Amino acid sequence: MQDIRVAAVASSSRVGEIQTNLENIRQWSAKAKEQGAELVVFPELSVTGFWLHRDAHRYAQPVPGPATDTLAQLASEMGVLLAAGISEECQGRYYNTHVLVSPSGILGTYRKTHINPYESPYYYEGNSLSVFDIGKARVGISICNDNLYPENLAVLALKGAEVLLMPFAYGGSNHNLWLASSACAAYRTRGLDLGCFVVAVNNAGPVPTPDGETNRYPGGAFVSDPEGEIVARTQGMGPGEKMLVADLRAKALHDRRSVPHFTLRLRRPELYGRVSELL
């Protein structure tokens, strides 16, 4: 790993208003670039918006497709890497997907692997845990509910991930309460256990939906280091859009992983078979 500067943007994504959302991504990416960011991370379904409804699939996009082409164009114009969420249509199936885009095109895609009961009528599960080399670091992506499964993230780390991107559409309206929640503490602990940086970013709200309802999100983002300590977090009380910029220092990762008692080095896989068995 080499030092890399990242931005996490707690953006507000309008359901189905893809061009509006892409323009918002462009504007925030430009602000991040002005502050020297090399990788800009956006929340879950940030391109298409998050809507659990039978009509939501009308907004799903092919990957690659026009929306990801626009992301690649933005990445090329600004000379940054972008990570953004999209409702993906593939051969009649729909996936909650995050795409990693470089100036030369799509570097990789990740489909959410742990679909909760509220989402299962609308999305299929992904079946792959991949790590992507972005030049200065190797990153893994784990979307919202996926981050409640330590095994998911452990596999990414064992495959070489140094940075874990965690995009969310986690409900609520209080920015500070979300960042102080036991859930966010758990996400930081995943980074501590695995010796990884964590870049977590939530949707901002409120966001009206086409059926007259309102999705409420607290906004917010944080970066924690391989010791599980917060190195940057968004500020302010309200749920509006926010951005942080943070430097991920390679030395912090090296120091955490070089200690004799580093957890991954002392694993006992022969004892863990039950973890892979269904209840």
Model segments located where?
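Short, acidic/polar
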Residues: 20-29, 149-154
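Short beta-strand scaffold segments in enzyme catalytic cores
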Residues: 84-86, 97-100, 130, 221-223, ...
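Extreme N-terminal starter segment of soluble prokaryotic enzymes
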Residues: 2-6
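Active-site catalytic loop in hydrolytic enzyme cores
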Residues: 89-189, 254-255, 259-262
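Cys-nucleophile CN-hydrolase/nitrilase-fold catalytic domain and related Cys-dependent amidase chemistry
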Residues: 18, 26-107, 170-194
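CN hydrolase (nitrilase-like) catalytic-core segments centered on the catalytic cysteine
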Residues: 63-81, 148-241
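A conserved C-terminal secondary-structure "cap"
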Residues: 251-279
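Short polar catalytic/cofactor-binding loops
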Residues: 10-15
